[in-house]
A protein has these predicted regions:
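Conserved G1/Walker A P-loop phosphate-binding module
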Residues: 1-108, 126
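Inter-motif core of Ras-like GTPase G domains
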Residues: 90-143, 160
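Fold-independent oxyanion-binding glycine-rich loops
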Residues: 80-83, 136-139, 173
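Loop/turn-to-beta-strand initiation segments
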Residues: 75-78, 130-131, 166
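Conserved ATPase-coupling elements of RecA-like P-loop NTPase cores
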Residues: 89-92, 143-148, 178-182
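Structural signal for conserved beta-strand scaffold positions within catalytic alpha/beta enzyme cores
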Residues: 79-81, 134, 198-200
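Canonical P-loop GTPase G-domain recognition
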Residues: 155, 159-168, 173-218
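Charged helix-capping and loop-helix junction motifs
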Residues: 148-154
């Protein structure tokens, strides 16, 4: 069947980077050149620093694509890139001093960024996802410290727990094998009783993705 993966969490943690790498590694290689080009156009942009780049919820790709998991298990997969929960210090949430208005698939009119993050995460998880992935960070890249992400991370995790969908937390880090990252993952596991893995979203390998999916699906 189709597996829809809702990618949620605070803004500026690498959600779009995760989706881009995921598609490049497991979906694109199995497609024709024309199809690859079409899907590449749909991949989210990743930003750096403090600026929020994802301002609307997107289904990527538009149609579910078949991928092979492990030995021979074929599933059709589609990822959902959601507007993240706001964190202190991130810019791009206001325009001309007012809260930025963003488009969502659920309302005809644009709604304030903060609302879009909350409603978007709820809808993505409730209505569209088979499994969830919360992407957060240990603060080792970008310019925002780890503490700035805790509150938004908690909102995302609690939202997923409410929906009772299987999910996993990824701690995106420049150095996923170093103590700081591992300690962050450990704290999240203890605090929320969830599985948390450390990864570098920008350098994900195919086996990382297999490991992530196996942890959530089985």
């Amino acid at each position: 069947g189709d597996i829809y993966i809702g990618v949620v969490g605070p803004v500026r943690t690498g959600k779009s980077t995760f989706i881009r790498r995921f598609m490049e590694l497991v979906a694109l290689p199995q497609m024709s050149d024309t199809k690859q080009a079409e899907i590449r156009d749909q991949l989210p942009l990743s930003g750096s620093g403090k600026i929020i780049t994802t301002a609307e919820t997107k289904f990527i790709p538009k149609e579910a694509v078949p991928i092979t998991l492990g030995e021979d298990q074929q599933v059709k997969i589609r990822l959902i890139d959601s507007v993240g929960f706001l964190v202190k210090g991130a810019s791009g949430q206001t325009e001309d001093g007012k809260e930025r208005m963003v488009k969502t698939p659920w309302f005809e009119q644009a709604i304030p960024f903060r609302e879009a993050a909350r409603i978007g995460t709820q809808k993505v998880i409730q209505e569209h996802s088979t499994i969830g992935i919360v992407v957060t960070t240990d603060g080792s890249f970008g310019e925002l410290p780890r503490d700035n992400f805790s509150e938004a991370e908690e909102k995302a995790i609690q939202e997923l727990k409410k929906q009772q969908k299987p999910f996993i937390v990824l701690v995106n880090s420049q150095m996923p094998y170093k103590d700081a990252a591992l300690k962050t993952a450990e704290e999240i596991q203890q605090k929320y009783k969830v599985t948390a893995l450390t990864v570098n979203c920008d350098q994900l390998r195919k086996e990382d993705i297999a490991r992530i999916l196996e942890k959530v699906l089985y």
